[in-house]
From Swiss-Prot:
One of its GO terms (cellular component) is cytosol. Pathway: Purine metabolism; IMP biosynthesis via de novo pathway; 5-amino-1-(5-phospho-D-ribosyl)imidazole from N(2)-formyl-N(1)-(5-phospho-D-ribosyl)glycinamide: step 2/2. GO terms for biological process: 'de novo' IMP biosynthetic process; adenine biosynthetic process; purine nucleotide biosynthetic process. The keyword Ribonucleoprotein does not apply. It comes from Leptospira interrogans serogroup Icterohaemorrhagiae serovar Lai (strain 56601). Its EC number is 6.3.3.1. HAMAP family: AIRS (MF_00741). This is Phosphoribosylformylglycinamidine cyclo-ligase. Keywords: ATP-binding, Cytoplasm, Ligase, Nucleotide-binding, Purine biosynthesis. It holds the Pfam family AIRS. Its main location: cytoplasm. InterPro entries: PurM-like_C_dom, PurM-like_C_sf, PurM-like_N, PurM-like_N_sf, PurM_cligase. GO terms for molecular function: ATP binding; phosphoribosylamine-glycine ligase activity; phosphoribosylformylglycinamidine cyclo-ligase activity.
Length: 344
């Protein structure tokens, strides 16, 4: 008997998709406050923007990002409950640089074949990240890509919308020579540099090492979720005038720090003040990589930077430490070409 032609036989199981939505519904809706109108499953997510009345002149901020090839490490290790935190962190930390308060978040998940248990773990991480950011998970899309992705492969993208008072928006324009750079410690490599990490730490860049200790190192240090700085920074902004901020992502220091600097200023970092930590020290020790290449690829122990005047540096440090951050004065602003980053 000839097989019946169906969408399911082509590789897309819509019934399993509906079951998945029901499975995650309660968890997702736990991020919803009174601002979210309606529940999960509609054609659009609805958000009550009357919250913007607290601003004199509200500016909306938006951001989108993914987690790169860190996903491949999560897939190999079969650990799926933290990669969603990474996804939220990469987005909310970016709009935070402008002083933005996250309002709502959306996600996109593409997979070769829908595995409800795996996807539930991924979404649970996204929910956790949203709660840490005080953002509502307003909606999302999960798409099966049979024939174009392997069954156990998946990819993630996130989208965030936030708000900031126009007069309080931070753009780096007031940064001057003599200002101090405060660095907030990262949890590890966060979500950047994983193509190099996989090349260095995986067999042929594709397979888990056979040594259990090396696998443990990957689990304990490389896969640790990206730190979310939202609550600490928003608390700081209420008390101290901040001139500029930097989220250290792809391209490390050399790509990210110049983005916030005005012409005629330059960042100068004191290498001995940067707490690279065990993960980066081991990478440096075990592999012959030039130090400047490490700073151009990784966060080297500092996930987020705050630039303040010299007179505000100590107070800003204390406020962030009171929020649980580990903070170091890692550099200063000097005169020079903004595109050149000094390490001394």
């Amino acid at each position: 008997m000839e097989e019946k032609i169906t969408y399911k036989n082509a590789g897309v199981d819509t019934e399993k998709g509906r079951e998945f939505i029901q499975k995650i519904k309660r968890n997702v809706e736990s991020t919803h406050g009174p601002r979210v109108i309606g529940g999960l499953g509609g054609f659009a997510g609805a958000y009550d923007v009357s919250v913007l009345k607290k601003y004199k002149h509200p500016i909306l901020l938006s951001g989108t990002d993914g987690v790169g090839t860190k996903i491949e490490l999560a897939r190999l290790l079969k650990i799926y409950n933290t990669i969603g935190i990474d996804l939220v962190a990469m987005c909310v930390n970016d709009i935070l640089v402008c002083g933005g308060e996250p309002l709502f978040f959306l996600d996109y998940i593409a997979c070769g074949k829908l595995d409800p248990e795996k996807m539930d773990q991924i979404v649970s991480g996204i929910v956790q990240g949203c709660k840490m950011s005080n953002a509502s998970l307003l909606g999302g899309e999960t798409a099966e890509h049979p024939g174009t992705m392997k069954e156990d492969e998946f990819d993630l993208a996130g989208f965030v919308v936030g708000a900031v008072e126009k007069d309080s928006m931070i753009d780096g324009s007031t940064i001057r020579s003599g200002d101090k750079i405060l660095g907030l410690e990262s949890s590890g490599p966060h979500s950047n540099g994983f193509s190099l990490i996989r090349k260095l730490l995986l067999k042929e860049g594709k397979y888990l090492p056979t040594d259990p200790q090396q696998v443990k190192f990957l689990k304990d240090y490389a896969l640790k979720p990206t730190r979310i700085y939202v609550s600490s920074i928003l608390k700081l902004l209420q008390q101290v005038s901040v001139k500029g901020m930097v989220h250290i992502t792809g391209g490390g220091y050399q790509e990210n720090v110049p983005r916030i600097l005005p012409q005629g200023t330059q960042s100068k970092f004191f290498k001995e003040k940067i707490p690279s930590g065990y993960f980066f020290e081991k990478i440096k020790k075990d592999h012959k990589i030039e130090e400047l290449e490490l700073f151009a690829t990784f966060n080297m122990g500092i996930g987020y930077m705050v630039i303040v005047s010299e007179e505000n540096a100590e107070l800003a440090k204390k406020i962030m430490e009171s929020s649980g951050e580990v903070v170091h004065e890692i550099g200063e602003i000097v005169s020079g070409n903004k595109e050149e980053v000094q390490f001394v």
